Amino acid sequence: CSQSRGLGDVYKRQLLLVNHDGKVVQGDKDVNVAAFAIHSRLHKARPDVNAAAHSHSIYGRTFSTLGKLLDPISQDACAFYENQGIYKDFSGVVEEVDEGDEIAKALGDKKVAILQNHGILTTGPSVDIALWFYMSMERCCQAQLMAEAAGKPISVSHETAVKTREFIANDIAAWASYQPAFDKIVKMQPDLLD
């Protein structure tokens, strides 16, 4: 999409198809330069990633200011255990693809990244999967912020975190978990796919 919009305000007809040089192939709006700088380089570095979700949501953005990874303090947080990168070189609005390259490098082969002082980014082989990981990560950021405000959270063991991650963080589980949210969105906005 060419402009920043809430997910509830995006329709299929507003989407742009952009080539690797930033030229609009389909659609009639201008390209969001910052989005192109991040997403184009991410897709170039990670051909397995068909979708990436990123916004400046309140809990992800707040958690990103801590400059650290999510801890495995809950079952849901275990989905991101040893599966998150961190980009610590925030220098304002991303305008150059070189910074997009650095963000892709920080993500590495992981599913998600924390962009320090900026927000969170999640990936997947489909939009559904990337969005599910985004929604889940946002809630995990919220939970860890609340837990740390209340005291010192206790992490689960490495073995438990790995076992839990393998069970809940696979693409099939993520896709299936997102379907009720998608159904609700389509029910609320039947013209979404127009």
Please report, for each region that a protein language model flagged, where it lies by residue:
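Short HxH-centered metal-ligating active-site micro-motif
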Residues: 19-61, 97-109
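Structural motif
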Residues: 23, 50-53, 60, 78, ...
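Class I SAM-dependent methyltransferase SAM-binding "motif I" and its flanking Rossmann-like core
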Residues: 58-95, 99
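A contiguous binding-surface segment within folded domains or other stable secondary-structure elements
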Residues: 85-121
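A conserved C-terminal secondary-structure "cap"
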Residues: 111-194
